[in-house]
Amino acid sequence: LGMPSVKILLFMLEKGEVRYTDLADLFTSRGTLSLNLKDLEEEKLIQRRVVASKPIQAYYSLTEKGKEIAKRMNEIKKTLS
């Protein structure tokens, strides 16, 4: 996992379910964000929930596997701080 993915996982660990727009604030490039979200979803670390409203909203949250990994990363981050 690269730093952008780690940043996403730690953000979700802290905030819970988040909207795409919440995550977009973490990145200068939405392309980078979209690629990382797709990779994390394929690895089954996050799940996406789409609400068919106007405008359509996408929500992301950690899977159990994602929570486990994010918790470990958070411990490492605390150790290094």
Regions found by a protein language model. Give the residues of each.
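Alpha-helical linker/hinge and terminal dimerization helices associated
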Residues: 72-81
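N-terminal leader segment of winged-helix/HTH proteins
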Residues: 3, 42-45, 62
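N-terminal helix-turn-helix DNA-binding core of bacterial DNA-binding proteins
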Residues: 1-31
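Canonical helix-turn-helix DNA-binding module
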Residues: 24-56
